[in-house]
């Protein structure tokens, strides 16, 4: 049996290696349309919105509390609907980790078009599309519509999901849970000026492209894909949108026991009209006696309101204080506001005008603050696994830290609570704070858990003895370059592995990034803590391998936070060198036009200009390439096309001291990469899938672990680090027999120097002990998969073996049918 399994794997490997030899990736098969989600079927059965009254349970929950590494995001739950307020980078990862179901989101509200609010939106929409959600309503500033169009630059047409955009000019939104009113607020600098472009709600699929007066473009200004508007937008940083959300009335609960005591026909068909009447507040007559509705029903809940408001800086304070819509909800008994959520920095909260505005809501209104004074840990699983890995090798797996704001939060005269990850405020059935879900990070518990695992301590001790007893290195290698793996997972951010990003510290004062997926800045914050500004100050360049969301959507955050870091360090802002496919510029151009100015942050080098023998497109690009080599002390920065999507590149960095680092990006085994990376010191190669999944690897244009190792061997690389693992291998990939003393496995926040190469293979036994349970589960899944393959192969062989060559197909099927049935019966 196992011999046949090995035969199947090797045959699959031969098929893959002998197949396509060109760099163009194979076309992907269209995925079948998913069945409607269960909650959507339930909603259809329930009938029109509001017909059964408001929901029984409603609460708000903090997803991200506003810290520098996570932004501010709020999740609202009812049994009918789910809502998300703001969707910055890392929000999807937090929702996945803390089991807040993304597939149930049917409304996303955005307070302004700032990257801290929308940085995770593209990835979230792609995930919603994959889950089969048919429609999502997005509300916020008018530029939101064009921002969503820009996603198609790298995602292609968003088929299968309708994105209905509601700008702030649209009427109020109403569903089964609540009515939402959008309140546009313009800063004092913006008041009195012409209102920006607006559009009514309509699906993006119906938007038609508009022609631009600047229709000509050169190599560095590529044409946008069909369906993406080329028109210059109206960037309006002076606009924020607040939301007033009013819960629907919830009818009282029918008191069954009380009804029985009164002799009502409980349990019969006659009780239905009685229940309907008393829930509507009507009295009934039973056996000549009038029964009031309040005798049979609990009091109805008229439905409180909550407010979500962002005040980015002091220029918005006066417009907020003077807003007439807010005034109608301040201190009014007929329009009680249970909670106001403030997304505001400390400089706003200490302003006396803003404090007076908060006080006008009255003493019964609670206030939740989300800003950088938050000290909450968000990514608990990442902290846990890093603490346990640190027991194996403290230098290679350093402990995580977090960015802490040095300013103390203000003291306020209103009931104010500082946000924490997973903090809840319940609106129904009763109003109260709920802190039981709040994350507590206890490293001691993580350590005890690891030490209690079978064979873990023994494996660590054996590794340390072997490290001490081993031969001393012939030469002590420099600390630099230092490789920091910030994201080692593929496709979407998950609780343990974030998406692609690798920091290469070339020297103490120079670094570059290899890819920059969503959440890269957050990973830097958790790795470096208060030193993150210093690290951003050393960043000289970013290489973006291709335009898939898990490789480039973290770039705007890096650009904006780098500007802040340089200012805090007292350094002038200068453009960051970005090596990428031309299409990246088109996406950044769209964001620049609609949301924030970012283009002055970058100097773009088209990745194709760094291919061997390529012509430099212009003298300006030639100067940028010279600057890149000089700044990073490189002899050469070369790219090559790899076998993934269109315009996908790998790269090779050759330092003046002689070392060579090669990065594959996403690719199937690629001869061009082998040639470019010849005699590399280090190859960082994607290994998305395990051995035995070669067919899936071809379909998804990725590599298996053994394929990645084979590329490194043919390249004659000194060492191979495997990277970009499918999220099905969240903790550790399956180790294959091809792992040797030249192969290591990357983890998020792993720090590797060239001198660590001999150590890396020795870490595998302790890693196997730490993740023994996960490895056992993966091996069981593999065995079941291989057993299915064996059965399919045997059945195919039996059917084929009973057929004689040259006979007509129908005759063969007729004559051999009894024999085939006999074989199956056996």
From Swiss-Prot:
Changing residue 217 to L: In HPC2; risk factor for disease development; does not affect the enzymatic activity. Its main location: mitochondrion. One of its GO terms (molecular function) is RNA binding. GO terms for biological process: mitochondrial tRNA 3'-end processing; mitochondrial tRNA processing; tRNA 3'-end processing; tRNA decay. Keywords: Disease variant, Endonuclease, Hydrolase, Metal-binding, Mitochondrion, Mitochondrion nucleoid, Nuclease, Nucleus, Phosphoprotein, Primary mitochondrial disease, Proto-oncogene, Transit peptide, tRNA processing, Zinc. Its EC number is 3.1.26.11. GO terms for cellular component: cytosol; mitochondrial matrix; mitochondrial nucleoid; mitochondrion; nucleoplasm; nucleus. InterPro entries: Metallo-B-lactamas, RibonucZ/Hydroxyglut_hydro, RNZ2-like, tRNase_Z_dom. The keyword Cell membrane does not apply. The keyword Nuclease applies. Widely expressed. Highly expressed in heart, placenta, liver, skeletal muscle, kidney, pancreas, testis and ovary. Weakly expressed in brain, lung, spleen, thymus, prostate, small intestine, colon and leukocytes. Residues 27-38, 208-224, 808-820 have a biased composition (Basic and acidic residues). Changing residue 622 to V: In HPC2; higher frequency in prostate cancer cases. Residues 16-51, 188-231, 798-826 are annotated as: Disordered. The modification Phosphoserine is found at residues 199, 208, 212, 229, 618, 736. It is an enzyme of class 3 (hydrolase). It catalyses: Endonucleolytic cleavage of RNA, removing extra 3' nucleotides from tRNA precursor, generating 3' termini of tRNAs. A 3'-hydroxy group is left at the tRNA terminus and a 5'-phosphoryl group is left at the trailer molecule. Residues 1-16 form a transit peptide. It is linked to Prostate cancer, hereditary, 2: A condition associated with familial predisposition to cancer of the prostate. Most prostate cancers are adenocarcinomas that develop in the acini of the prostatic ducts. Other rare histopathologic types of prostate cancer that occur in approximately 5% of patients include small cell carcinoma, mucinous carcinoma, prostatic ductal carcinoma, transitional cell carcinoma, squamous cell carcinoma, basal cell carcinoma, adenoid cystic carcinoma (basaloid), signet-ring cell carcinoma and neuroendocrine carcinoma. Homodimer. Interacts with PTCD1. Zinc phosphodiesterase, which displays mitochondrial tRNA 3'-processing endonuclease activity. Involved in tRNA maturation, by removing a 3'-trailer from precursor tRNA. Associates with mitochondrial DNA complexes at the nucleoids to initiate RNA processing and ribosome assembly. Belongs to the RNase Z family. This is Zinc phosphodiesterase ELAC protein 2. The gene is ELAC2.
């Amino acid at each position: 049996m196992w011999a046949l399994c090995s035969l199947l794997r090797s045959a699959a490997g031969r098929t893959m290696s002998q197949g396509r030899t060109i760099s163009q990736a194979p076309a992907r098969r269209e995925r079948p349309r998913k069945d409607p989600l269960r909650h959507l079927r339930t909603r259809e059965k329930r009938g029109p919105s509001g017909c059964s009254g408001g929901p029984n349970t409603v609460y708000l929950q903090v997803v991200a509390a506003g810290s520098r590494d996570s932004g501010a995001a709020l999740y609202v739950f009812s049994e009918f609907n789910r809502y998300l307020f703001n969707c910055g980078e890392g929000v999807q990862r937090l929702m996945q980790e803390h089991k807040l179901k993304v597939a149930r989101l049917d409304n996303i509200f955005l307070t302004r078009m700032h990257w801290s609010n929308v940085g995770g939106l593209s990835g979230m929409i792609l995930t919603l599309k994959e889950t089969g959600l048919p429609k999502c309503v997005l509300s916020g500033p008018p530029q939101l519509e064009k921002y969503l169009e820009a996603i198609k630059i790298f995602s292609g047409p968003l088929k299968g999901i309708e994105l209905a955009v509601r700008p702030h000019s649209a009427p109020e939104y109403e569903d089964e849970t609540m009515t939402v009113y959008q309140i546009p607020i313009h800063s004092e600098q913006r008041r009195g000026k012409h209102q920006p472009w607006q559009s009514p709600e309509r699906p993006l699929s119906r938007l038609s492209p508009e022609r631009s007066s600047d229709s000509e473009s050169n190599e560095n200004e590529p044409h946008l894909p069909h369906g993406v508007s080329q028109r210059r937008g109206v960037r309006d940083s002076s606009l924020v949108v607040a939301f007033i959300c009013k819960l629907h009335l919830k009818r009282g609960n029918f008191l069954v026991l009380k009804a029985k005591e009164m002799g009502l026909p409980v349990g019969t068909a006659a009780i239905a009209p009685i229940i309907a009447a008393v829930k509507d507040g009507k009295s009934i007559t039973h056996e000549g006696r009038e029964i009031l509705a309040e005798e049979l029903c609990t009091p109805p809940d008229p439905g409180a309101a909550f407010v979500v408001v962002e005040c980015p800086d002091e220029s918005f304070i006066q417009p907020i204080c003077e807003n007439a819509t807010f005034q109608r909800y301040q201190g009014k008994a007929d329009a009680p506001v249970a909670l106001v959520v403030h997304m505001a920095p400390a400089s706003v909260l200490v302003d006396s005008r803003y404090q007076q505005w908060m006080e006008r809501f009255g003493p019964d209104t609670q206030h939740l603050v989300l800003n950088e004074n938050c000290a909450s840990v968000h990514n608990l699983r990442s902290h846990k696994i890093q603490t346990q890995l640190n027991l194996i090798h403290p230098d290679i797996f350093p402990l995580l830290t977090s960015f802490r704001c040095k300013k103390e939060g203000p003291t306020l005269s209103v009931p104010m609570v500082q946000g924490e990850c997973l903090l809840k405020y319940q609106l129904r059935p009763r109003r109260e704070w709920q802190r039981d879900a709040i994350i507590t990070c206890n490293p001691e518990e993580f350590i005890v858990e690891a030490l209690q695992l079978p064979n873990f301590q023994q494996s660590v001790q054996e590794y340390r003895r072997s490290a001490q007893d081993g031969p001393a290195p012939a030469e002590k290698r420099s600390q630099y370059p230092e490789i920091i793996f910030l994201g080692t997972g593929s496709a979407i951010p998950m609780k343990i592995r974030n998406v692609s990003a690798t920091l290469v510290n070339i020297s103490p004062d120079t670094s570059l990034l290899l890819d920059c997926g969503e959440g890269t800045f957050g990973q830097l914050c958790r790795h470096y803590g208060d030193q993150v500004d210093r690290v951003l100050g050393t960043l000289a360049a970013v290489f973006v391998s291709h335009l898939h969301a898990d490789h480039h959507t973290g770039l705007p955050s890096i650009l904006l936070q780098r500007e802040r870091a340089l200012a805090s360090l007292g350094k002038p802002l200068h453009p960051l060198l970005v090596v990428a496919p031309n299409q990246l510029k088109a996406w950044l151009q769209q964001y620049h036009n609609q949301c924030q100015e970012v283009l002055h942050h970058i100097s773009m080098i088209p990745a194709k200009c760094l291919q061997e023998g390529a012509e430099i497109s212009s003298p300006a690009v030639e100067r940028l390439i010279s600057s890149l080599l000089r700044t990073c002390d490189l002899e050469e920065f070369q790219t090559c096309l790899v076998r993934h999507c269109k315009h996908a590149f790998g790269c090779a960095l050759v330092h003046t001291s002689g070392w060579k680092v090669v990065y594959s990006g996403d690719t199937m085994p690629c001869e061009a990469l082998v040639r470019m990376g010849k005699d590399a010191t280090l190859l960082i190669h994607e290994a998305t899938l395990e051995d035995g999944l070669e067919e899936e690897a071809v379909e998804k244009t990725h590599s298996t672990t053994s394929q990645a190792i084979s590329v490194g061997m043919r390249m004659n690389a000194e060492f191979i680090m495997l990277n970009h693992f499918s999220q099905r291998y969240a903790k550790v990939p399956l180790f294959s027999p091809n792992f040797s003393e030249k192969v290591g496995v990357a983890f998020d926040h792993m720090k590797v120097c060239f001198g660590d190469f001999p150590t890396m293979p020795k870490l595998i036994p302790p890693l196997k002990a730490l993740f023994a349970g996960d490895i056992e589960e993966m091996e069981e899944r593999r065995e079941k998969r291989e057993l299915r393959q064996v059965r399919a192969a045997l059945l195919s062989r039996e059917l084929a073996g009973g057929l004689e060559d040259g006979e007509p197909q129908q005759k063969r099927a007729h004559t051999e049918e009894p024999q085939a049935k006999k074989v199956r019966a056996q």
